[in-house]
Regions:
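A short glycine-rich, hydrophobically flanked beta-strand micro-motif that places a catalytic Asp/Glu
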Residues: 1-6, 492-496
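Acidic, glycine-rich flexible loop/linker segments
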Residues: 7, 14, 18-25, 30, ...
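Non-catalytic terminal/interface segments that mediate subunit docking, oligomerization
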Residues: 29-110, 332-349, 353, 358-371, ...
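Conserved alpha/beta-domain cores
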Residues: 188-540
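A short, conserved beta-strand element enriched in hydrophobic/aromatic residues
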Residues: 13-14, 386
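Amphipathic alpha-helical
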Residues: 18-60, 391-415
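ATP-grasp fold ATP-binding core
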Residues: 1, 164, 318
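Phosphate-binding site of ATP-dependent enzymes
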Residues: 5-11, 420
Length: 540
């Protein structure tokens, strides 16, 4: 425990005790969930299967169904609960149906966005009607080791408040059974002293969870996502921090300041009370900051800094912000600063957003946070990655922006590009040279949708579904690895493919010669074991 002197700023350690929880945790164990095959067959014959979908992970979860069609229903439920508590009722007096969501409940909805993440962390099982194995629900479920069944067409027909069991331990199909179903949990140990040629890294996005994940036998972080910090820790659109003074001026005078003119149409359609609410919310959170942008920078650098510190000195590859416009619109103030796009997945995102004069001030706050992590915190294991970079010229301009702030390649910060577009593969040599790259990381999620021209959020709706195992994607991955290795640069993969297919995909990657594989924490041990076997077979 520590205390800081409010006058002098001195920091005092006032108490220290041996840590007894995480130090005893064993990182060389793999948990396997099993449901008896005869029992599963019997349940199917009895008609106990309420719904099916794509299984995410290999676990089993059971709990009470809490069905919400939209996140606004969650917010309304919270408001009603608050009224009951303010009237003098205690939580013990309030029925569980009015509690909104309790630890261990089963979350059922159409499709999740970052807004849902606080509820998702408490769930024993997540079921969505839409989405595939690379959807938001699947990615977050994997990171927290929560079973999920996505693309479940009958999800919204599940009986609310009923007890169900969701099994992802029976192959690619996830089954939702009625009532509680018995299952077994088995722990398997492995030898973590085996040295691998291929580095195994983690995909992380939740700073506090990285303290636990860092105990796993991995070589660092191959993908650190900052979107959770933006949505849950801040929850306000970054441009609202930039334009705080002008927003306040608009609320007070009713006249639109020059700095907000690019968003004139949004203000015409907005209720001034919504803008007032945005300003009040921002000021209540940033009351201690004269310049409201400093709150954004502080929260971002603290979150990224925690991840870097947890894994230090192992490298942490931080992907610069990659929210799409529809995701930014979910943040407070998002409807003012974001357009409504037909297909946000392939529109205003990644590098093109950073360079846009409208968004550039927000990206500059991001740069300031990263610079502080490296220089103020001294965490020199920070690496940066540019996502959704369409052309080498675009990549060079982003690199130049980083260089101007002493956080680019010339100042010793490793720069990577997310290899997720056909152009990244076709012009790989130019990307490497013009961006002075230290390496690349294959984003198989977006690579599938850009190679096959399909929306990754709706893959389950296609007659002939494709994924990272499909021939064109595998051919492109092999070509990407060859080009990066020819220049002696690191080339890894951070998409969901190795996590979704831990027995099948890593051997293919090793055959390609990939240098690192980054996976979700729940599959790290299984992938490590698969890689060890594949390397032994290949005499690596």
């Amino acid at each position: 425990e520590w205390a800081k002197d409010g006058v002098t700023g001195d920091l005092f350690i006032v108490q220290a005790r041996p840590e007894t929880i995480h130090s005893k945790a064993q990182s060389n164990k793999m948990t396997i969930y099993k449901i008896d095959e005869k029992l599963a067959d019997s349940l199917k014959k009895q008609g106990r299967v309420l719904a099916t979908g794509q299984a995410v992970g290999k676990r089993i979860g059971t709990g009470k169904v809490r069905l919400y069609r939209t996140y606004s229903e969650v917010l309304e439920g919270k408001r009603e609960l608050r009224k009951l508590l303010e009237s003098g009722m205690s939580m013990e007096e309030i029925s569980s149906e009015l509690s909104v969501f309790e630890e261990g409940d089963v979350l059922v909805t159409e499709m999740t966005t970052p807004d849902w993440e606080p509820l998702m962390k408490q769930a024993s099982l997540i079921i969505t009607r839409k989405g595939g194995r690379t959807s938001h629900a699947a990615i977050i479920a994997r990171e927290f080791g929560i079973p999920a069944i996505v693309g479940c067409s009958d999800a919204m027909d599940l009986p609310n408040f009923a007890t169900v069991t969701g099994s992802c331990a029976e192959g690619d199909t996830g089954y939702v059974y009625s009532d509680k179903v018995p299952f077994e949990i088995e722990e398997v140990s492995f030898d973590e002293d085996i040295e691998l040629t291929t580095k195994i890294k983690l995909n992380v996005g939740f700073p506090t969870k990285s303290l636990i994940d860092s105990k796993l036998p991995v070589d660092g972080v191959g993908l650190a996502r900052i979107e959770f910090i933006l949505s849950s820790e801040l929850g306000i659109h970054p441009l609202a921090f930039v334009h705080h003074d002008e927003l306040k001026q608009f609320v007070e005078s009713g006249e639109l300041p020059a700095g907000l003119k690019p968003y004139q149409e949004s203000f015409i359609e907005s209720d001034i009370n919504d803008v007032r609410s945005l300003v009040e919310s921002l000021e209540s959170r940033a009351w201690a900051y004269e310049d409201k942008r400093d709150l954004f920078i502080d929260k971002l650098r603290e979150g990224v800094g925690l991840i870097c510190a947890a894994f230090y000195p192992r490298p942490v590859l931080v992907r610069l912000s990659d929210f799409k416009s529809n995701e930014y619109r979910e943040l407070l103030g998002g409807s003012i600063f974001e357009p409504v796009e037909e297909n946000p997945m392939i529109a205003w995102r990644g590098a093109s957003r950073y360079l846009d004069e409208k968004f550039k001030p927000a990206f500059e706050m991001e740069i300031a946070a990263m610079k502080s992590v490296k220089y103020d915190f001294g965490l020199d294991n920070l690496q940066l990655m540019v996502p959704f970079c369409r052309t080498p010229e675009e990549g060079q301009m982003v690199k130049d922006l980083l260089e101007e702030n002493d956080i680019g390649p010339s100042s010793g910060t490793d720069l990577f590009v997310m290899v997720e577009l056909p152009s990244n593969a076709i012009e790989a040599d130019r990307f490497m040279d013009m961006m002075a790259l230290s390496g690349g990381s294959i984003g198989s999620n977006d690579l599938v949708q850009t190679v096959y021209a399909v929306s990754r959020d709706d893959l389950e709706g296609y007659q002939n579904p494709v994924d990272a195992r499909s021939p064109a994607v595998k051919s492109m991955i092999r070509d990407i690895v060859r080009k990066f290795k020819a220049k002696n640069l690191e080339i890894g993969i951070c998409g969901q493919a190795p996590s979704d297919f831990p027995d099948e995909f890593p051997p293919f990657l090793i055959d390609c010669g990939i240098t690192s594989i980054s996976v979700t924490p729940d599959t790290a041990i299984a992938v490590r074991a698969t890689v060890a076997a594949a390397e032994k077979a290949a005499n690596l």
